[in-house]
């Protein structure tokens, strides 16, 4: 028996997914199950620190898939699942954040992987070490800064290695244990460009240890908490009204928040 299931996207909450499967298994214990479709849309321009269903933020798609995939992997009476879809594709009648595009893909329409693609890679590629700073989709950030205090923002890493150490501009932010193939650090942003790097130890088959690394630059626009004539002179300000998402313009790379 197969179902197209979207609990936590078109309605309900994420835990409705496993509840539905359990209910169906109770009714039909001898029937193998397949989830023939599941997925959530994401728009590279939209990011949220409080992601919720149908906001099309990159973060909600990650949250959704980080919930669904373990259920599919760990539920013994589920034979398999098909993520909808692998690639963002044209869909003439859609009128969402990206008109005429179904953006549930793990990769963009030009085949560039979204960050969440590397979550699947970390889960399934147990033959190779995977370490990916999941911020390629959010390299232009902004935040409200009080005085000169750093602005803490999350940076996620996808990995199949047991522990990750994260660095900002060469300074260690410590190590964290991996849970569900993810590690999330609160990173203090304070200037226009930061160099973020991640390192993890990988035990080779011969019991030797190699160091796996990933790195990228993140641009940051601090927005003064108290705007005045002086600090507005060199600041291009955009205001996003009515949304809990950050929005980054394709043309200007200007990032705005509520």
Where are these regions (language model features)?
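Extended substrate-binding grooves/exosites of carbohydrate-active enzymes
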Residues: 1-176, 186-189, 194-195, 199-202
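Edge beta-strands of extracellular beta-sandwich domains
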Residues: 203-223
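Compositionally biased, intrinsically disordered or flexible polar/acidic segments
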Residues: 220-258
């Amino acid at each position: 028996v197969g179902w197209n299931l979207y609990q936590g996207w078109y309605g309900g909450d994420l835990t409705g997914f496993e509840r539905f499967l359990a209910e169906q298994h109770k009714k039909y214990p001898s029937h193998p199950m397949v989830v023939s479709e599941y997925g959530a849309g994401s728009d590279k321009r939209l990011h949220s620190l409080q992601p919720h269903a149908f906001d099309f933020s990159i973060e909600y798609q990650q949250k959704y898939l980080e919930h669904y995939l373990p259920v599919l992997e760990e539920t013994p009476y589920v034979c398999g699942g098909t993520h909808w879809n692998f690639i963002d594709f044209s869909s003439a009648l859609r009128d969402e954040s990206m008109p005429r595009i179904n953006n549930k893909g793990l990769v963009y329409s030009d085949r560039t992987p979204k960050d969440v693609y590397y979550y699947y890679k970390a889960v399934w590629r147990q033959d190779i070490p995977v370490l990916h700073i999941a911020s390629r989709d959010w390299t232009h950030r902004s935040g409200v800064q009080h005085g000169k205090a750093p602005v803490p923002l999350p940076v996620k890493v996808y990995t199949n290695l047991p522990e990750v150490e994260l660095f900002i501009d060469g300074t260690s932010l410590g190590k964290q244990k991996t849970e569900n193939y993810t590690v999330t650090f609160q990173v203090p942003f304070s200037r226009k460009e930061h160099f973020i790097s991640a390192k993890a130890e990988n035990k080779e088959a011969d019991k030797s240890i190699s160091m796996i690394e990933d790195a990228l630059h993140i641009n940051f626009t601090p927005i003064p908490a108290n705007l005045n004539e002086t600090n507005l002179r060199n600041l291009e300000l955009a205001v996003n009204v009515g949304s809990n998402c950050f929005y980054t313009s394709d043309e200007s790379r200007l990032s705005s928040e509520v």
